[in-house]
Amino acid sequence: MSEISLIMLAAGNSTRFNTKVKKQFLRLGNDPLWLYATKNLSSFYPFKKIVVTSSNITYMKKFTKNYEFIEGGDTRAESLKKALELIDSEFVMVSDVARVLVSKNLFDRLIENLDKADCITPALKVADTTLFDNEALQREKIKLIQTPQISKTKLLKKALDQNLEFTDDSTAIAAMGGKIWFVEGEENARKLTFKEDLKKLDLPTPSFEIFTGNGFDVHEFGENRPLLLAGVQIHPTMGLKAHSDGDVLAHSLTDAILGAAGLGDIGELYPDTDMKFKNANSMELLKQAYDKVREVGFELINIDICVMAQSPKLKDFKQAMQSNIAHTLDLDEFRINVKATTTEKLGFIGRKEGMAVLSSVNLKYFDWTRL
C-alpha cells in the first residue's frame, strides 16, 4: 500500500459564497463542512498524515485531535505550500473541503492509477456547447478539473517553489514538465462555490441544537464622560472606568455571544493592554465579535439582559437600548429583552459605586436550507 498523506484546503474567505458564514463552517448535522469532508476522505484510506489549512486554528482544533492544522495563506497556492512543509510521504492527496461528497468510487479510481503519472486528477467532460469570445470551442478537448488530486510530493513542492499562482496541483505539475493522468470525475465532486450550489448537492441539514452563553461584567463609576449602555447615552457625566468607552452592557453581551459559540471571551479578542482599543466604541466591538460568530456557522435566537444599578434609573432607556442592539446585530427586536434592577441598596451597586450586567443568549446553527 502506497504511503500517502492528505491535505484538506479549508482556509478560504468564501467571498463568492456571499453569506455571513464561511462555507467551510456550514453545519452538516453537527459537523462543520470542513470536518465532514475530511472525515469522508479519511474513511477511504489509512493516510500517513492529515493536514488541514485553516484561518481559525484554535477553533477548529476543538473538533478533533486527529489532524494537524496550519494557518492558511492569502491564496490557495500559498496555503498548499505551507501545508506541504508538514508532509514527507511519497505521495500527497490534495482536496478542497468544498468538494464535500467525493465518492469511494472516485477515490478508488485515483488510487488504482497512482503509478500512471506524476499527478492523477479527476476530470469531467463538457456536454454543452462552449463559447470563448463568441467562438465555439471543441468541447471534446475541454476538461473540467476536480479534486482530490494525488501528486508526487517532491515534484509538487518543487512546482510550488516557483512562487507562481496555480489554481490546482495538475497545472503546477504540468508546468514542471510532469505527466498528468486523468480519471473520470463525478457530478458529486463539483465544488461548492456559490450558495446556489447547495441545492445541487444532497447534504445533511444542520442539527437543531441550541447553544447558550452567559456574560457578566462589572465597572466602577468615576470617569467624567458619558455613561453608555448598548450605545445609548444614559447620563452625560456618570461614565464608567474602562479601557474602552465603558459600555458595560455591550461588554457583557459580547462575552455571552462569544461563549455560546465557544470562541473565548472579550478579553482575548480585545485585550485592555492593546492601545488600539483605548476608548473604543464597544457596540462596534460587539458587532465585530458577532461577525466572527456568524463566520463559524452560528446565528442568534434571542438575547436577555439584566442591568444591575442603584442609580441612574433606566426605565426610560430600555426601549432605546433594545432598538440599538437590534440594529447593531441585525436581529429582530422582539428577540431582545433588556431588564433593569437594583440591589436594594446592598453591596457596591447599592452604594452607587458601580454597576453590573448579566447577559444570556441562545445561538443556533445557521440554517443554510433557507438560502
Curated annotation (Swiss-Prot):
Q: Which cofactor does it need?
A: a divalent metal cation
Tell me the segments the record calls region 2-C-methyl-D-erythritol 4-phosphate cytidylyltransferase: 1-210
Q: In which pathway does it act?
A: Isoprenoid biosynthesis; isopentenyl diphosphate biosynthesis via DXP pathway; isopentenyl diphosphate from 1-deoxy-D-xylulose 5-phosphate: step 2/6; Isoprenoid biosynthesis; isopentenyl diphosphate biosynthesis via DXP pathway; isopentenyl diphosphate from 1-deoxy-D-xylulose 5-phosphate: step 4/6
On whether Lyase is a keyword of this UniProt record, the answer is yes
EC number(s)?
2.7.7.60, 4.6.1.12
Q: Which GO terms describe its biological process?
A: isopentenyl diphosphate biosynthetic process, methylerythritol 4-phosphate pathway; terpenoid biosynthetic process
The answer to whether UniProt assigns keyword Manganese to this entry is no
Question: What's the catalysed reaction?
Answer: 2-C-methyl-D-erythritol 4-phosphate + CTP + H(+) = 4-CDP-2-C-methyl-D-erythritol + diphosphate; 4-CDP-2-C-methyl-D-erythritol 2-phosphate = 2-C-methyl-D-erythritol 2,4-cyclic diphosphate + CMP
Transition state stabilizer (site feature) positions: 16, 23, 243, 342
What are the UniProt keywords, alphabetically?
Isoprene biosynthesis, Lyase, Metal-binding, Multifunctional enzyme, Nucleotidyltransferase, Transferase
Listed binding positions for 4-CDP-2-C-methyl-D-erythritol 2-phosphate are 217-219, 243-244, 265-267, 270-274, 341-344, 348, 351
PROSITE patterns for the chain: ISPD, ISPF
State the PANTHER family in the record. 2-C-METHYL-D-ERYTHRITOL 2,4-CYCLODIPHOSPHATE SYNTHASE, CHLOROPLASTIC (PTHR43181:SF1)
**Family designation:** In the N-terminal section; belongs to the IspD/TarI cytidylyltransferase family. IspD subfamily.
Q: Give the protein's function.
A: Bifunctional enzyme that catalyzes the formation of 4-diphosphocytidyl-2-C-methyl-D-erythritol from CTP and 2-C-methyl-D-erythritol 4-phosphate (MEP) (IspD), and catalyzes the conversion of 4-diphosphocytidyl-2-C-methyl-D-erythritol 2-phosphate (CDP-ME2P) to 2-C-methyl-D-erythritol 2,4-cyclodiphosphate (ME-CPP) with a corresponding release of cytidine 5-monophosphate (CMP) (IspF).
Task: Identify the NCBIfam families for this entry.
Answer: ispD, ispF, PRK09382.1
Protein's name in the database: Bifunctional enzyme IspD/IspF
Gene field = ispDF
